[in-house]
Design a protein with these regions (language model features):
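A short glycine-rich, Lys/Arg-flanked "PGG" loop and its adjoining helix->strand segment in the class I
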Residues: 255-267
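C-terminal alpha-helical "lid/dimerization" subdomain adjacent to the S-adenosyl-L-methionine
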Residues: 274-328
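Core SAM-dependent methyltransferase catalytic element
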Residues: 329-350
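Short helix-to-turn junction characteristic of helix-turn-helix DNA-binding domains
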Residues: 40-44, 191
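A short acidic, leucine-rich amphipathic alpha-helix
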Residues: 50-53
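Conserved adenosyl
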Residues: 112-249, 254-256, 272
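Conserved Class I S-adenosyl-L-methionine-dependent methyltransferase catalytic core
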Residues: 2, 6, 17-22, 28-33, ...
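Short amphipathic alpha-helical interaction segments
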Residues: 57-68
Length: 350
């Protein structure tokens, strides 16, 4: 077959860009851990000698790091002054840990997937799964930080108000269960905003529950939040409102989880399901966000589900498949409540 040289060069250009992005992901994590972005944000324009002095690293490393970041557009370079700086937009994404657009946690989580390449290759080859607890430890912290920024930006201001009557009930005081709570960021955000309500978070990963419990104490919400180790199919209690954040598609038994949530809800209860944004048609997911989620799905989400003998819904399951799971649990009402570029928020009722 004849190769179209123009198309070949276009593809090679894309691949080179991806190679640069791959290695730069490591340097984003390095930059956060060593306070390099923070130094630029606090001090203004710096050259490599000044950055090295402020952060205690070798100047040669500072020089290479600065130019990698400038080449990728993550920082800016003033050639006349020979200094590097963080524009305000990049400050919000790389130096402000409380910003809803803060990114280094995302890089930490996705970089952890590369550290598990041998496990992923084995899972592919041997048609087996990878349990959540068998991944590199950076995944747990990175995923929580990745999700937390989205929850801070949207959960209270957008997602909960999109549900039928839930916000008012939360302010009055109800019982809430957060299934698959991980490190508890979603649970704690809700507990801070709705102090009259009581919250319980369940997760089958003991280390995550230990972390969540400590973070609830640190946040001063332990009086209304508790965390327990439990599988999504057999947790205890009766609730007015249930939530599952970015976890249903990972589960080994999502249908069983839906049945247990249905069983645990009161007759007038409601279930909010937060899932990665996805269309039912794979072709419509062939974009930068879909690419990111399919990558996470192939390395983490589907292997996690398969490890539990699950259906492997994946991070791009789409509304129809999620709806089928929800309805299999006994729910009669299911709708898209709202959406963002990164998430779809569903509401289900008995």
């Amino acid at each position: 077959m004849t190769i179209d040289d123009t198309k070949l060069q276009e593809f090679l250009g894309k691949a080179v860009s991806d190679l640069g992005a791959t290695v730069s992901s490591t340097l984003v994590v390095v930059g956060e851990k060593l306070g390099l972005y923070q130094a630029l944000a606090e001090s203004g324009p710096l050259n490599s000698h000044e950055l090295a002095e402020k952060t205690g690293i070798l100047e040669r490393y500072a020089f290479e790091w600065l130019n990698n970041q400038a080449a990728g557009g993550y920082i800016a370079y003033d050639s006349k002054a020979n200094k590097y700086y963080l524009p305000e937009e990049q400050k919000a994404c790389l130096a402000d840990k409380d910003s809803p657009t803060y990114l280094p946690g995302s890089f930490q989580s996705f970089l952890s997937m590369a550290k598990d390449e041998e496990k992923v290759t084995k899972a592919f080859k041997e048609k087996q799964g990878i349990h959540w607890g068998d991944h590199h430890c950076d995944l747990y912290e990175g995923v929580e930080r990745f999700f937390r920024t989205k929850y801070l930006a949207n959960l209270i201001s957008n997602w909960i108000p999109s549900l039928d009557g839930i916000e008012e009930k939360l302010r009055d005081g109800i019982h809430v269960v957060d299934v698959g709570c991980g490190h508890g960021s979603s649970t704690i955000i809700m507990a801070k905003e709705y102090p009259n309500s009581k919250f319980v978070g369940f997760d089958y990963h003991p280390e995550s529950i230990k972390t969540a419990t400590q973070r609830a104490q640190d946040a001063g919400v332990s009086d209304r939040v508790s965390f327990e180790v439990s599988d999504s199919t057999n947790f205890s209690g009766s609730y007015d409102f249930a939530t599952v954040f970015d976890a249903l598609h990972d589960m080994g038994n999502p249908h069983g989880a839906a049945k247990q949530i249905y069983k645990s809800l009161k007759k007038d209860g409601s279930w909010m399901i937060v899932e990665p944004f996805s269309s039912d048609k794979p072709r419509e997911n062939h974009n930068p966000i879909g690419r990111m989620f399919y990558g996470a799905s192939a390395t983490v989400c589907v292997p996690c589900s398969i490890a539990g003998n699950g259906p492997g819904l994946g991070a791009q399951a789409g509304p129809t498949r999620i709806g089928d799971v929800v309805k299999s649990g006994g729910f009669t009402k299911f709708r898209v409540a709202t959406q963002t570029p990164m998430n779809i928020i569903y509401e289900a009722n008995p």
